[in-house]
């Protein structure tokens, strides 16, 4: 799974996904891409599940790019622990995905295969998405 090698701080604020994405809104590598419509937090496990679903559909042909990286540590308190007594320990990493952000890109497969792969990947993600083409 994706995780940063080094962090400046061990824990992060919860934060919000407020505005539209300023960068990463156009296709840079592939011919087809998966663009987010909502703003939400996507975990490393969800990204990995989407990657596996897409590559399985592509039958390891073509190329898949992941344009997002989980860099925000999400902390959680253990089960059945009372409120207070500090913040919990970091459990997993996530990325805050803004509306309009390209998350996956595909190149080197037929159009129907690419569209099916991106549909399968989007089913694994918590955000609403749309599929974009390079020449649209």
UniProtKB/Swiss-Prot annotation:
GO terms for molecular function: rRNA binding; structural constituent of ribosome; tRNA binding. It comes from the Bacteria. One of its GO terms (biological process) is translation. GO terms for cellular component: cytosolic large ribosomal subunit. The keyword Nucleotidyltransferase does not apply. Keywords: Ribonucleoprotein, Ribosomal protein, RNA-binding, rRNA-binding, tRNA-binding. Gene3D superfamilies: Ribosomal protein L10e/L16 (3.90.1170.10). Belongs to the universal ribosomal protein uL16 family. NCBIfam families: rplP_bact. Part of the 50S ribosomal subunit. Binds 23S rRNA and is also seen to make contacts with the A and possibly P site tRNAs. This is Large ribosomal subunit protein uL16. It comes from Rickettsia felis (strain ATCC VR-1525 / URRWXCal2) (Rickettsia azadi).
